[in-house]
Design a protein with these regions (language model features):
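Nucleotidyltransferase catalytic core that binds NTPs
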Residues: 1-186
Length: 186
């Protein structure tokens, strides 16, 4: 089975995340995209109390596509308060799905631009083929990282903008309802 990881904080998940995953299914022929909401991301300061809500919102948002799966692997790996390092997640996914070669990993240019600062980035680079999507950040070459630039047009939407502006997301009404019902991002 050809799978691809799509890890992120998804705080909250939005249309651009879904468009990226749909594009990857169509243009790369993946049989499954595994969304992995970060439990305690090492690179962002977010309220860990929102973790269960972020996980639920990703489940709600991806329910329409049977080839989308949402994994709680980082919640299990971080149950004792450990940070969610991509290296540990990738190793566990490779083990669970019996993947011998490199695993595909969707990532935005904003995150990939900082990849060299990630936990054990050199070791991670040996396990992953990155598919990099434009996020409005100019990318400098990353020596030693197996990656390709996706040819998908840039979608100018971010979770930060959605939270700050409380923008209606017409394609994700159920997520919007979940946010309101649970009083998130007030």
């Amino acid at each position: 089975m050809t799978i691809c990881i799509f890890a992120g904080t998804f705080n909250p998940i939005h249309e651009a995340h879904l468009k990226v995953a749909e594009y990857a299914l169509k243009h790369y022929g993946f049989e499954k995209i595994i969304f992995i909401p970060a439990f305690i991301p090492p690179h962002k300061d977010i309220n860990s109390d929102l973790a269960k809500h972020r996980f639920e919102m990703v489940k709600i948002a991806t329910a329409y596509e049977p080839r989308f799966e949402v994994s709680d692997i980082e919640y299990k790996l971080g149950a004792d308060g450990k940070k969610s390092y991509s290296l540990n997640t990738v190793k566990k996914i490779k083990e669970l799905y019996r993947i011998d070669g490199k695993i595909n990993f969707l990532i935005g240019t904003d995150a990939f631009e900082k990849i060299e600062s990630w936990y054990k980035a050199d070791e991670l680079s040996k396990l992953v083929h990155f598919i990099v999507f434009q996020r409005g950040v100019k990318l400098t070459p990353k020596i030693g990282f197996d990656f390709e630039m996706a040819q998908m047009p840039f979608i100018d939407v971010s979770s930060t903008d959605l939270r700050k502006n409380h923008t209606e997301n017409n394609n994700l009404k159920k997520v919007e309802e979940y946010i309101k019902k649970n009083g998130l991002y007030n």
